[in-house]
Amino acid sequence: MSETFEELYASLLKEVFTTHARQQLEQGADGLVAARTYAEQGKPEFALAFLLLIDGTEEEKREVFAHAYERRARLSQEKAAQLDAQFHRSFPLIKLEAQKDLMAAQAIRQGRPIRITKVPPVS
């Protein structure tokens, strides 16, 4: 049996995002609307927080979460192009992060886990 949305993605979330989402829901926010709004802004962490707290189909949650990563990738690509033009040089790390976001979106749509690479702290 395949893993649920929560089993696949809950471990990616920091408590601060869940706390924010919970507060918004307690104030009467519509969780699905909030998740979609954050997804459109390219903020997958916020979208995920709402998606984990609301009822909805696995497919619907995957779609919104994947869209958040795709939107963030698009915004990153636009920012990289803007910086390329402004500073007359490329910004490959921004483009690399956009590629990772697109791969994450694809994995989410397929119901697979995603890998989040974390930069170790500088000592």
Regions found by a protein language model. Give the residues of each.
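Generic helix N-cap/helix-start motif at coil->alpha-helix transitions
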Residues: 12-17, 25-31, 41-45, 58-65
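Structural register within alpha-helical repeat arrays
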Residues: 20, 34, 47, 65-68, ...
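Alpha-helical solenoid repeat scaffolds, predominantly canonical TPR units
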Residues: 37-38, 50, 83, 101, ...
